[in-house]
Amino acid sequence: MIDRCRSCLHLFNKHWVSEASGSIVVTETASDGASQAVFKTDKPCVIVKADKNAPLLWALAQRKCADGAFFLFDKDGAHLHIVELKSKIRLATWALTLNQFQGMFLTALAVARLLQVHELVRVTCYLAGTEDRITNESESASPTLLKAPVGMTKTFGGHESWDKGVVELPLSFKAALVKGWKARAPPRATILILA
């Protein structure tokens, strides 16, 4: 499958979509949360980098986008990994992050189609932060975000997805949520090893 993808990489600007192996680095450049998430793998990957002026796909209604994503290829097929880096994670931040995951998912899906990837084995969302302000609800944002609208089962802030560790994405996709905590001192990197 990776060979077919390689034959299509020329369709992309190498700054935004390229092949990677060994270490995959996703970087947050905003000064208040500047950090990196580093993934280690021996499998072939294609990385999708985000621009600070998201979205990468101009026609999307969802204008927000996560910091990066990558496709990991193994014998089963293509696995999509979506990565967002934050500093303090409050409920309001989490609601924004859900939108960023959705925007990057749709962008990555468009990239996948151009790479001749028509099916994803699994989608995983990663969120790395320095401080969890969601688990302790007294430290979180407005209580309004903890309430569900009348007749609905989901809260305004998406608290239930945080608790369950599942992110609902467009087109009926569901992704496992992996939470990581980065050090407060430089280089503030979260390192994950992928099999």
Locate the predicted segments by residue.
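Alpha-helix termini
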Residues: 73-75, 109-118
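Domain-level recognition of nuclease-like catalytic cores that cleave nucleotide substrates
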Residues: 116-195
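Conserved catalytic cores of phosphodiester-cleaving nucleases, focusing on short active-site segments
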Residues: 68-70, 79-87, 104
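Acidic-basic catalytic patches of nuclease active cores, encompassing PD-(D/E)XK
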Residues: 1-61, 179-187, 193-195
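Short, flexible beta-strand-to-coil junctions
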Residues: 72-76, 130-132
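Short, surface-exposed coil-to-beta transition loops
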Residues: 63-66
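Mg2+/Mn2+-dependent nuclease catalytic core
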Residues: 88-108
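Active-site nucleophile-His-acid catalytic modules used for acyl/amide transfer and hydrolysis
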Residues: 83-92, 117-121
